[in-house]
Amino acid sequence: MSWNYRIARKTLKCKVDLSDDYYEEDCFGIVECYYNEEGEIYATTESFIEPYGETLEELKWSFNKMKEAFEKEVLDLDNIVYAKI
C-alpha cells in the first residue's frame, strides 16, 4: 500500500452569525491519500494538512511532495467513493 499528497475540494457548511441560516462554501486544501494494492483510494485525511517536519530537511521534503499534488487530478471529497483495503 502507498500514499501521496493530493489537492482536494470539499463543501463547508457555514453558519451565518447568530441566525439559523447557513451557506455553503467550496474550499481547497491538501490531504494525505492512501491507496490499496490495486492503486485505488481507500482513505484520505479528514482535515486539510500543512507542511511539517521535525527538521528543515523533513519540512523541505514534505513541501516538495505537496507541490507534486498540483500535477494530479483534484479529488472531490463530497462525492468520493472509497475502495476496500
Residue spans for each PLM region:
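A short, exposed loop/beta-hairpin motif centered on an aromatic-Gly-Thr core
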Residues: I41-E57
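Low-complexity intrinsically disordered segments
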Residues: S2-N4, L56-I85
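Short N-terminal "domain-start" leader segments
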Residues: M1-V31, N36-E38
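Residue-level marker of intrinsically disordered, low-complexity segments enriched
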Residues: C14, G39, S47, D78-N79, ...
